[in-house]
């Protein structure tokens, strides 16, 4: 099942996106999040008592961890 694809931009995808025939599906994901004090707490009842908090978002490197695809 051959297919011809022009310009394709996927902003956000969960799962896999297949075009045409495929042999091996290996989805990859990169995520970076900056959370302040108590920002990523999860649960039914969460009580946080935070004073003054500052999050450093300066990132001097180009890539944190490259994902290299293998065929």
UniProtKB/Swiss-Prot annotation:
Entry's Gene Ontology BP terms: sporulation resulting in formation of a cellular spore
Note the InterPro entries from the entry.
Answer: Spore_germination_GerPA
Query: What's in the keyword line of the UniProt record?
Result: Germination, Sporulation
Superkingdom of the source species:
Bacteria
Bilayer-crossing regions = none
- What does the entry say induces or represses the expression of this protein? Expression is sigma K-dependent and negatively regulated by GerE.
What's its job? Required for the formation of functionally normal spores. Could be involved in the establishment of normal spore coat structure and/or permeability, which allows the access of germinants to their receptor.
Would you identify the family this protein belongs to, as annotated?
Belongs to the GerPA/GerPF family.
Please state what the protein is called. Answer: Probable spore germination protein GerPF
Organism, as annotated: Bacillus cereus
